Amino acid sequence: QVQGQLHTAQTFGLDYVNTMSDPAREAADCGAVVEYFDEQPVAIVEDRALLADKTHLARLKIPDPLGGGRMHNSIKALALFQEQIGREKIIEGWVEGPIAEAADLRGINTLMTDFYDDPAFVRDLFSFIVEMELRFAREQVNAGADVIGIGDAAASLVGPDLYEEFVWPLEKQLVDGIHAL
């Protein structure tokens, strides 16, 4: 990944490299089932969602970003970028936003009904995710990331009322936490 990013940046005169390869990194380190393909990014196997049984959230542990999993691979890539290009280009790390990661852990369709059927669970899940993503972001900054991107496209699937009540406060907490690093 590092050599591909560096080659692309050099070939096209880009001032930026990043480690965002797919949205399944954190979920995989939590224990989610992911599928690998030859011609597309890694994907979550939604019909085997890690939190299909939402009671499992109480036992779910935040993975160590330096624990040898896919998150650690991203951190090692950032360290290689820092070693090879230093301040020559912007180095971007990446985390998932609360609703995107919740969809990866719970399944997008199930999560959408959870907003109505069990809003307390959604809040607990989002809080778990923000804590995990802040730990991951911290280690990425420590490894050399200049900026941290956040992917939360699934937020576009909820209306303004749900967004304001559930998503916005946790996205703001995540952004504020990253700014504080």
For the regions a protein language model found, what residue spans apply to each?
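Short, glycine/charge-rich beta-strand/loop segments that flank catalytic centers
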Residues: T19-D29, G93-A100
